[in-house]
Design a protein with these regions (language model features):
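C-terminal His-loop and adjacent cap/lid subdomain of alpha/beta-hydrolase
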Residues: 2-465
Length: 465
């Protein structure tokens, strides 16, 4: 374990910012690191580092930088159109943790680094790695998770010997942490956790709360987050399932909202049209709480109870489902397949200037209510076979946190028979729809069989007893 000092421009930390220091990799990360995946099965290496430096303390503007999430008016914050910041204290010290997942061989590295703020529920989950480690691993991408300040106390509570030196003053130091992490990554020198890797692009992403963090950084700090030579620290942003307005930037932005998000958190008012550097997708039938990808050779962290950050909502999926239609099933929409395609399309946008597809929004009435087609599913939006060749009505909850959860209400067998005839004819329709999605770049070819398997599982052509 070693350390190296880094010379920094005044990245969100004031003119008197201290030099940042990187320490690591820490010993025995796969065995001792909290919330760290075992990635040896996909020929990756998991490492932990500590990054120390200084960052400004700001007046909060978002759930992502509030000391208590419950203290914020999320509808107002997510719809903000004015992006100045008030600095309360300049250049305050911090030490945070970085989790790095990288290919064991530098020759496998794609040149892409994906960074995310770790989620504050349960001590810091890496949501985008959880969903897309299969894609990142097969592509050779590097993932870097940046510990959210409000999750540091939980790490120290569980393992003070390992994490006792982590420290921060205020949740709003997150923005300086993200900027300095990005600058360290792109530095590629002795002070970089990725020294020796030739980095072409660094992307910031997130889902739900971490999607809000991504959009908030893009809105308030992208324009000042520069390297000494004037280059952007982050080359693209992919905020997902966060409902937040994102201002026009000088780099590509690609947004994803589910049927829970586009209207449930004020997202309907935060739409803007696609342009030369912006795409906004809404996925009909998808719910905010999405099904995980199939298990593979990467092993998730051992279950451990870590304290959540203050104000995080607590709700029961089982309680929410009691309010769903009788006989309905959990939403099975494979959001991870479209997320993988989004990253693939973003890479082509960056590397080849090949523009990604555009889509229409989910359709609504004058009051903002979702318009339904004759099968009971949302009209418009990006449409996977779940709603384009349906055997169920897909919906989301309508009250408080239950809007995060979705359901599928299966059609009676007689309805499926009337629509498609039999299972073979239904699967043929699904197959044709999948080929359309691949051709239009909404899913990748390796998602073909997973979509077919989901269709086979929901092909109810016999009455259930």
């Amino acid at each position: 374990m070693g350390s190296a000092a880094l010379q920094w421009p005044a990245l969100l930390a004031g003119a008197n910012a201290r030099n940042a220091q990187l320490i690591g990799p820490l010993p025995d990360t796969p065995a001792r690191g909290l919330m760290v995946w075992d990635v040896s099965g996909i020929d990756y290496v998991a490492e932990e580092y500590f990054l120390s430096g200084s960052a400004n303390v700001y007046r909060p503007v978002s759930m992502a930088d509030a000391a208590d999430v419950a203290s914020r008016d999320n509808f107002k914050d997510l719809g903000a159109r004015e992006f100045s910041r008030e600095i309360l204290k300049a250049a305050r010290p911090f030490t945070t943790r970085l989790i790095v997942y990288r290919p064991r061989s530098k020759q496998r590295f794609s040149g892409k680094v994906v960074a995310e703020c770790l989620h504050p529920t349960g001590g810091g989950g890496s949501l985008m790695w959880n969903s897309l480690h299969g894609f990142f691993g097969s592509h050779g991408d590097i993932y870097v998770g940046v510990q959210h300040p409000l999750t540091i106390a939980g790490l120290k509570t569980v393992d003070s010997a390992r994490y006792g030196s982590l420290d921060f003053e205020d949740a709003t130091q997150l923005w300086g942490m993200l900027a300095k992490t990005g600058a360290a990554i792109k530095g590629e020198g002795a002070g970089s956790p990725l020294r020796g890797y030739r980095i072409r692009h660094l992307l910031l992403t997130g889902y739900s709360y971490t999607g809000v963090a991504t959009a908030t950084f893009a809105n308030y700090h992208h324009q000042e987050a520069k390297l000494p030579d004037g280059r952007n620290i982050f080359d693209a942003y992919l905020p997902m399932a966060d409902a937040q307005y994102v201002r026009p930037l000088n780099v590509p932005v690609m947004r994803l909202n589910t049927q829970s998000d586009y209207n449930g958190f004020g997202g309907l008012k935060n739409r803007r049209p696609d342009d030369a550097r912006y795409r906004h997708y809404e996925f009909a039938g998808a719910a905010h709480v999405a099904v995980p990808p199939p298990a593979d050779a990467a092993k998730p962290p051992a279950a451990i109870k870590l304290p959540s950050a203050p104000g995080q909502p607590h709700f029961s999926a089982a309680d929410c489902r009691q309010g769903f239609p009788p006989g309905s099933l959990p939403n099975d929409y494979p959001l991870y397949l479209v997320q993988a395609a989004m990253f693939s399309n973003m890479y082509q946008w960056l590397d080849l200037r090949r523009a990604p597809p555009s889509s229409v929004f989910i359709e609504t009435n004058a009051e903002g209510g979702t318009l339904l087609d004759d099968k009971g599913n949302a009209q418009g939006g990006v449409r996977l076979p779940q709603v384009s060749v349906p055997t169920a009505k897909y919906g989301v909850g309508s009250t408080d946190a239950c809007v995060l959860f979705g359901y599928a209400e299966p059609f009676p067998a007689a309805v499926s028979q009337a629509l498609y005839g039999d299972k073979a004819a239904f699967l043929a329709r699904v197959q044709a729809d999948i080929e359309r999605l691949i051709a239009d770049r909404w899913i990748l070819p390796d998602g073909r069989e997973q979509l077919l398997e989901l269709a086979r599982a929901r092909a109810n052509f016999e009455e259930r007893s």
